[in-house]
């Protein structure tokens, strides 16, 4: 260690003669000194998953392993390594088979983080049968805890965002059906409603909005329940997201029907006192059609 210290001082001073006298440091010692002696990220990912899948490990330890795994896959390369290390399958096993909702929520959070703005991971996830269907079913299940459903919506939003093919599969699996019940539920927490609107926005930003899609949104009650949020909500974030969604429809050339316009008028009476605290462009864009 003393030799390493002498070399380091000489190196920082640019003293080539002193560096020559000290000689080259031991690479292993350098690695230890600068924290490079531990396992690499892929190894840590595999070790974390082994802990998660071990039936003898207690819940708290598994949740810590999930936290460690998620921190690792915030790195894009590590997220893509989930496929290379064959870790999607055990992760999906936890998602579907676990009886512990905390573990299910942790698995959903990892899925959402891994596929966020990551085309490779989006495609990798879709290689596994029923992965998308499972996310939709969990998001739709009113018996699931708030944290689980919220993270299911988070995972779905990130999975379909900016991906036309996955968005179309989401549509064919009736994924839009999980949105309206949340928005029309007066007991639903604001966080869940915001995630539902985020999913709706992610879908619409990934496909061409046409009359067929609008027809389905009307049939499923999505447009009506979204508009009704303007009358029922005092949460500014939710109101802003609703206005953004409606403005998106308007900019796509969609015309509201008579019933929708009536509900919009009622909603605007409710939010008018809040207008100075809302997104001005969206507020005016929607008001213009009234």
From Swiss-Prot:
<feature type="repeat" description="ARM 5">
    <location>
        <begin position="211"/>
        <end position="251"/>
    </location>
</feature>
<dbReference type="InterPro" id="IPR011989">
    <property type="entry name" value="ARM-like"/>
</dbReference>
<feature type="repeat" description="ARM 3">
    <location>
        <begin position="120"/>
        <end position="161"/>
    </location>
</feature>
<dbReference type="InterPro" id="IPR013918">
    <property type="entry name" value="Nucleotide_exch_fac_Fes1"/>
</dbReference>
<dbReference type="GO" id="GO:0000774">
    <property type="term" value="F:adenyl-nucleotide exchange factor activity"/>
</dbReference>
<keyword id="KW-0597">Phosphoprotein</keyword>
<feature type="modified residue" description="Phosphoserine">
    <location>
        <position position="12"/>
    </location>
</feature>
<dbReference type="Pfam" id="PF08609">
    <property type="entry name" value="Fes1"/>
</dbReference>
<protein>
    <recommendedName>
        <fullName>Hsp70 nucleotide exchange factor FES1</fullName>
    </recommendedName>
</protein>
<dbReference type="GO" id="GO:0071629">
    <property type="term" value="P:cytoplasm protein quality control by the ubiquitin-proteasome system"/>
</dbReference>
<feature type="repeat" description="ARM 1">
    <location>
        <begin position="13"/>
        <end position="57"/>
    </location>
</feature>
<dbReference type="InterPro" id="IPR016024">
    <property type="entry name" value="ARM-type_fold"/>
</dbReference>
<dbReference type="GO" id="GO:0005829">
    <property type="term" value="C:cytosol"/>
</dbReference>
<keyword id="KW-0963">Cytoplasm</keyword>
<comment type="similarity">
    <text>Belongs to the FES1 family.</text>
</comment>
<dbReference type="GO" id="GO:0005783">
    <property type="term" value="C:endoplasmic reticulum"/>
</dbReference>
<dbReference type="InterPro" id="IPR050693">
    <property type="entry name" value="Hsp70_NEF-Inhibitors"/>
</dbReference>
<feature type="repeat" description="ARM 4">
    <location>
        <begin position="164"/>
        <end position="205"/>
    </location>
</feature>
<keyword id="KW-0810">Translation regulation</keyword>
<keyword id="KW-0677">Repeat</keyword>
<comment type="subunit">
    <text>Interacts with the Hsp70 chaperones SSA1 and SSB1.</text>
</comment>
<feature type="repeat" description="ARM 2">
    <location>
        <begin position="76"/>
        <end position="116"/>
    </location>
</feature>
<comment type="function">
    <text>Involved in protein translation, propagation of [PSI+] prions, and polyamine tolerance. Functions as a nucleotide exchange factor (NEF), which accelerates the release of ADP, for the cytosolic Hsp70 chaperone SSA1 and the ribosome-associated Hsp70 chaperone SSB1. Required for fully efficient Hsp70-mediated folding of proteins.</text>
</comment>
<dbReference type="GO" id="GO:0006417">
    <property type="term" value="P:regulation of translation"/>
</dbReference>
<feature type="repeat" description="ARM 6">
    <location>
        <begin position="253"/>
        <end position="290"/>
    </location>
</feature>
